[in-house]
Curated annotation (Swiss-Prot):
Species assigned in the record: Chloroflexus aurantiacus (strain ATCC 29366 / DSM 635 / J-10-fl)
HAMAP family according to UniProt: Thymidine_kinase (MF_00124)
InterPro entries, per database record: P-loop_NTPase, Thymidine_kinase, Thymidine_kinase_CS
Swiss-Prot/TrEMBL catalytic activity: thymidine + ATP = dTMP + ADP + H(+)
Name of this protein: Thymidine kinase
Length: 193
């Protein structure tokens, strides 16, 4: 973990659906709160699965958060924070380059930036903002789920439509839960066609 005297840094928590990304973000932010560091937690406006103004894991852990749409919104609310946490980075409305620039700007000013999000979309293609932040981050933690088909480590998010893999021409971002996505390993993942 970083100390305030260490200066800014970017930490990325990534993985497929149901790998515990938000749970890990919440765990880190609870430590920040215990350490009495000033912080802000942000969640994207597009994520409507849980109550507005909360970051929530699939297991039920929750923390208060600020719901925003863009990096400009984050920067407007993060002025005095020592730590900025951004959940579901891949769901923000903003241009991916703006998200990356904003995270860099905060870290360059001494802020510890913790982002969590999917590294790959349902087609197993990288989300652009996450791809760049993975390369720029001081710390990267890739988490794994358990494949629903075979029990191996899962690294892919299989989107389902009526119980079948979504086609390649389906929208890249569709917010959903267990009814729409399954965690799958490389072998059990069915590529979108």
């Amino acid at each position: 973990m970083t100390r305030p005297s260490d200066g800014g840094r970017i930490e990325v928590i990534c993985g497929c659906m149901y790998s515990g990304k938000t749970e890990e973000l919440i765990r880190r932010m609870r430590q920040v709160r215990i350490a009495r560091q000033s912080y802000r937690i942000f969640t994207p406006r597009m994520d409507t699965r849980y109550a507005e103004g909360q970051v929530a894991s699939h297991s039920g852990s929750r923390l208060e958060a600020i719901t925003v749409a863009t990096m400009k919104d984050i920067l407007a609310h993060a002025e005095d924070a020592q730590v900025v946490a951004i959940d579901e980075l891949h769901l923000f409305d903003d241009d991916p380059a703006e998200m990356v620039r904003g995270c860099q700007w905060l870290a360059n000013r001494g802020v510890r930036v913790i982002v969590a999000g999917l590294d790959l979309n349902y087609r197993a293609e990288p989300f652009p903002a996450m791809m760049h932040l993975l390369a720029l981050a001081e710390q990267v933690d890739k988490l794994y789920a358990i494949c629903v088909k075979c029990g191996a480590y899962a690294t892919r998010s299989q989107r389902l439509i009526d119980g079948k893999p979504a086609p390649a021409d389906a929208p890249t971002i569709v917010v959903g839960g267990l009814d729409m996505y399954e965690a799958r390993c490389r072998t059990c993942y069915e590529p979108a066609v």
